[in-house]
Amino acid sequence: MIVNAEAFLQMYKDVWAGESVKPRGQLCKEVTDYKLSLNMSDSPWTSFKARNLNIKYAKQEFLWYSRADKYDNSIEEYASMWQKIRQDDGSYFSNYGQYIFPKQFWFVVNELLIDPDSRRASIVLLKSEHLFRANKDVVCTYAINFRIRNGKLDMTVMMRSNDCIFGTTNDVFCFSMLYRMVHSMLETEVGTYTHFVNSLHVYEKHFPMIQAIIEGGMSNYMHVDSFWPTPNEATMAVFGRLMPNDGKWAKWLYE
């Protein structure tokens, strides 16, 4: 199945055909209010040879979220950009785990167990104080909504901003892991993931890369298998206690 890879390739084409804008003086191409629809039965990890993304980093970012510690600087070992956006007090606004785990995660699960037709099963990430101009790190995600419709679990992620070269793929991976954790707690079929972004963009320095991805097409696609958590593994992750020997999903994340 290559449904998600085709959706990503179309996304790159759409962004490249977008408008030129210069937020904070940085030239980029942008499409607004973009919707990326993904089949959660397919792999959430989409990589192309022209931009061979680092799945080890994506796993580490998710595990970093699961620890839910806004002062945990271990992520800087895997990507130097985190050092550049660390707040003066040593914290990171964009460690999403501090908002998700454990309280909001369990709210979503319990809400859907009590009322499978609920529209309230949401996780809110962005706070007004994140948007202050003096902040180095500004949260890119507004909220995540989960719904059960026609017996399937659907998820919508709503973002204000997303860099399609680096951000989108890693965000989709991490949010897909969150989806799998919620799914493990419910008796539903697998549904869809809608990734909605106000500003989906590519920076000027990555123009050659996005052109190479588009020109290579599906011949550049590289599939990566992944695992689903058991309820026990998901629970361990919620409390930041997931260890490699907790199961196949845990072992795969730590590889």
Please describe what each predicted stretch is.
Residues 1-255:
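Terminal, non-catalytic protein-protein interaction segments that mediate quaternary/complex assembly
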